Amino acid sequence: PEHLNTPLWDQLEAQINLGMQGKNKGLPMGFKKLSNYISNIQPGRYDLIGGATGTGKTALVDSAYMYNPIKYITQEKETDFSIKILYYSIEITPLQKIAKMVCRKLFEDYSILVDSESLFSRGNRSLLDKDIAKKVFATRDYFEKMLSDHVIFYSAASPDYVWMTVKDYVEKNGTIVRNSNKMIQEYIPHKPNEIV
């Protein structure tokens, strides 16, 4: 029989060869058991997380798809991957999200447990301790670099807005190949190892 000689078969062989070179490990998400089932964060794969209200979906997604991968990339010298996160938040503002990220960093680096409302000394909470405030302010460079290199926050999130901003990002950061019916046939990113 004649061998299959198609672009699809070529892609199959290329993926097998990359895997044999250890280049299909993906980007670690910080949850080993989960990664055993879904093989880490992989380029070109869409993961959907669903569940009831208040069950920790946002906390899981933030940890697995933002905090842990960014931490891995910034600390690991041998990774081929980079990551860019287009973060659409309907529930909380970018300021609130950054405050939560700062609280997490305080806990990771100093074992200081503080929530974002306490960080802002809101309501009947005590004023934030000056030593903790100094530690918060010392994280500025870390977070500014993280945001400039890895995260773009969007506070509006209608379906049309999401489509428009993703389309703009894709067009600026890659080449879209269309067929004669103008359907997208292939996307060739300028940075093939960047997971978006």
Q: Regions from the language model: what does each represent?
A:
Residues 2-110:
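The Walker A/P-loop phosphate-binding site
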Residues 36, 72-191:
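Cytosolic-facing regulatory segments adjacent to core modules
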Residues 192-196:
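Short acidic catalytic loops
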